[in-house]
C-alpha cells in the first residue's frame, strides 16, 4: 500500500474547475446529485466548479471515486 501526498492550491487553476465540471457531466450527474453523494449542500459543490472555494483533500478523494477519475485528471486534465 502506498500513499500519495497531494499539495496544490486548486483555486489558482481554473483548469481544475473546468475538469471537475466536464468529469461530472461525463459521469451523467447533476451538481445536486454529486453534492448529495458528498453530503454537502449543492451551493458548496457549485462553488468548487466556479472556483469560488476549493474542496479539501478528503472531498477530492471522494470526488475522484464518485466521478471515476484520478486526482491528476481533475487537476491537470
Task: Walk through the language-model features, giving the residues of each.
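DNA major-groove recognition helix of helix-turn-helix/homeodomain DNA-binding modules
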Residues: 39, 58-73
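A detector for short, charged/polar N-terminal pre-domain segments
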Residues: 1-15
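Short amphipathic helical patch at the helix-1/turn junction of helix-turn-helix
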Residues: 14, 25-26, 40, 54
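Short basic helix-loop element that most often maps to the first helix and adjoining turn
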Residues: 18-37
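Conserved hydrophobic/aromatic packing and binding residues within compact polymer-binding modules
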Residues: 20, 34-35, 45-48, 74
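Residues that mark the N-terminal boundary/hinge immediately upstream of a DNA-recognition element
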Residues: 19, 30, 56-59, 70
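Recognition helix of helix-turn-helix/homeodomain-like DNA-binding domains
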Residues: 39-55, 77
Amino acid at each position: 500500500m502506498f500513499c500519495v501526498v497531494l499539495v496544490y492550491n486548486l483555486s489558482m487553476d481554473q483548469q481544475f474547475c473546468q475538469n471537475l465540471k466536464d468529469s461530472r457531466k461525463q459521469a451523467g450527474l447533476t451538481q445536486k446529485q454529486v453534492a448529495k453523494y458528498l453530503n454537502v449542500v449543492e451551493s458548496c459543490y457549485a462553488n468548487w466548479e466556479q472556483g469560488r472555494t476549493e474542496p479539501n483533500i478528503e472531498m477530492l478523494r471522494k470526488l475522484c471515486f464518485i466521478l471515476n477519475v484520478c486526482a491528476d485528471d481533475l487537476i491537470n486534465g
